[in-house]
């Protein structure tokens, strides 16, 4: 009896025993992002009385448990259960009740900055994991799967591997497209995105009222049928995602509105307009897209995509200057290809020692509109952030000595613990890469269609998010400020064929406690005193 009991204890300690769960979130793998994913899922599960996250990885169970306990103090209503084993093994997947899971998240074992052969192998393991889950379900419909895959080819393969829901995220593609948009908008757009992807803030929901739309309805009318929640677009009966459609686009009985809201419990649809706007005109002056001068520091897996996306956005006369420590032939090949496709943009790639203060000074950083500082990779996340911070300090020293207007400094941060240091370096827009990707993966595990919205939001065609000056919407020629209900801002944006998600108060732009001046989806009756320096957060086709 003693030996059997000891063997059973040893099995439990090694994490080999059966998991008796249903409707749980199953995570396969245990990497850098695991803590951020768990935090997001705990937030998403707050309204559930008893939720479970089950993790299967080839790590030691005790090590996984200790790491989770050491970094997460409050699990609210969520239980986190770990099991040790090979994630592609069908018997192991049966032990963690993969077929009964609410959703499955597959972590990629290779970071985006790792060598290509390592990433290819990691992608192959993700594909094998998907096939193993399909096998566990005996070919029947499987739980929704969200995974991260580096190769576009393998991503397409993953999404078409079965009849079930498989959503594959390409970290480099998503982050690159977002960074490109940050370079073109006013400061603060990263705060909007961070709020949108995290469960601890506002999110978009696919909404249809139980009693129907209450008669004929078009998209423009739908904007005024919610007090604070804001429709961003339509998910039609054919499965299409259409963000900021023309206002006369009908919302049919089978369509869902894509609604930006604090929570699905805060979405209330009214059959009649909730606000009667008085604004019926907007400033008539034509705003032309202005040329930009943008610098990119360092060559990474993201640089090429960022350059391509910026070229697709930028108007004639713009300049893109990339500075690298070692110039390679493939960089010139990309530059020549882009120059041929976008002859109206001046593109250059130059070799510079970015660690040399004098060489940096010769670049005249103060003459750029935006400077994008990318992390070139490293052995650890801390090492990568340390490099970025040291480069920021050198640029900051040059800008202080020039005492001119600073360019917009944008950087990516790997570890959210380094945000305060980054902000004190003069950065006005930043993106916590690990956190951002983890949040999207967690969100897509709860709502698979969310990834389709992000894919639409981060491409040059159609509408993207911008923070535009209030003077685009209201005439300030005779007044320094205007006081009005937020509903008038919604109406002014609609007259410009835009949807707004909120405001940016200029005086609070440096205040982290006030979300850097960002106010999202207030009630339409809430009054604001708006100055021309303030901004409106718009879903629009371009920056004008």
Kindly label every feature range from the protein language model.
Residues 3-544:
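Cytosolic regulatory regions of ion transport systems
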């Amino acid at each position: 009896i003693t030996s059997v009991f000891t063997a059973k204890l040893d099995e439990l300690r090694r994490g080999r025993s059966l998991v008796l769960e249903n409707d749980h979130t199953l995570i396969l793998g245990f990497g850098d992002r695991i803590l951020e994913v768990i935090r997001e899922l705990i937030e998403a599960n707050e309204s559930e009385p008893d939720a479970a996250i089950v993790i299967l990885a080839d790590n030691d169970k005790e090590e996984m448990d200790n790491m989770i306990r050491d970094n997460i103090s409050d699990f609210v209503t969520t239980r986190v259960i770990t099991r040790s084993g090979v994630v592609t093994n069908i018997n192991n997947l049966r032990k963690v009740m993969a077929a009964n899971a609410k959703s499955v998240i597959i972590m990629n074992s290779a970071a985006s900055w790792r060598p290509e052969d390592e990433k290819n192998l990691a992608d192959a393991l993700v594909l094998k994991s998907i096939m193993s889950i399909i096998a566990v379900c005996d070919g029947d419909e499987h739980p929704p799967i969200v995974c991260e895959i580096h190769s576009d080819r393998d991503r397409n393969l993953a999404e078409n591997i079965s009849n079930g829901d498989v959503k594959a995220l390409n970290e480099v593609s998503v982050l690159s497209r977002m960074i490109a948009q940050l370079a073109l908008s006013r400061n603060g757009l990263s705060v909007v995105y961070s709020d949108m992807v995290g469960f601890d803030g506002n999110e978009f929901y696919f909404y249809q009222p139980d009693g129907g739309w209450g008669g004929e309805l078009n998209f423009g009318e739908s904007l005024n049928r919610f007090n604070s929640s804001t429709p961003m677009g339509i998910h039609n009966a054919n499965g299409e995602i259409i963000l900021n459609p023309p206002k006369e686009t009908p919302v049919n009985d089978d369509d869902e509105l894509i609604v930006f809201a604090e929570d699905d419990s805060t979405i209330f649809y009214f059959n009649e307009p909730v606000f009667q706007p008085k604004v019926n005109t907007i400033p008539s002056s034509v705003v032309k897209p202005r040329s930009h001068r943008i610098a990119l520091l360092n060559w990474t897996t993201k640089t090429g995509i960022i350059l391509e996306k910026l070229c697709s956005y930028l108007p004639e006369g713009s300049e893109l200057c990339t500075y690298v420590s070692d110039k390679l032939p493939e960089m010139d090949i990309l530059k020549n290809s882009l120059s041929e496709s976008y002859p109206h943009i001046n593109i250059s790639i130059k070799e510079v020692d970015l660690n040399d203060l004098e060489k940096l000074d010769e670049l005249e950083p103060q003459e750029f509109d935006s400077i994008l500082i990318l992390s070139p990779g490293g052995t650890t996340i801390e090492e990568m952030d340390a490099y970025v911070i040291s480069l920021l300090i050198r640029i900051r020293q040059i800008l202080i000595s020039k005492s001119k207007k600073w360019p917009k400094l944008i950087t990516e941060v790997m570890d959210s613990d380094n945000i305060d240091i980054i902000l004190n370096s003069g950065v006005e827009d930043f993106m916590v890469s690990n956190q951002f990707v983890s949040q999207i993966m967690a969100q897509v595990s709860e709502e698979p269609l969310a990834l389709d919205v992000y894919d639409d939001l981060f491409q040059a065609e159609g509408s993207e998010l911008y923070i535009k000056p209030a003077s685009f919407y209201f005439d300030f020629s005779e007044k320094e400020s205007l006081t009005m209900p937020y509903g008038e801002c919604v109406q002014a944006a609609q007259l410009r064929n835009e949807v707004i998600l909120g405001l940016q108060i200029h005086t609070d732009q440096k205040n982290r406690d006030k979300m850097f001046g960002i106010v999202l989806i207030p009630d339409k009756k809430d009054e604001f005193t708006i100055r021309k320096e303030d901004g409106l957060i718009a879903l629009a086709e371009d920056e004008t």
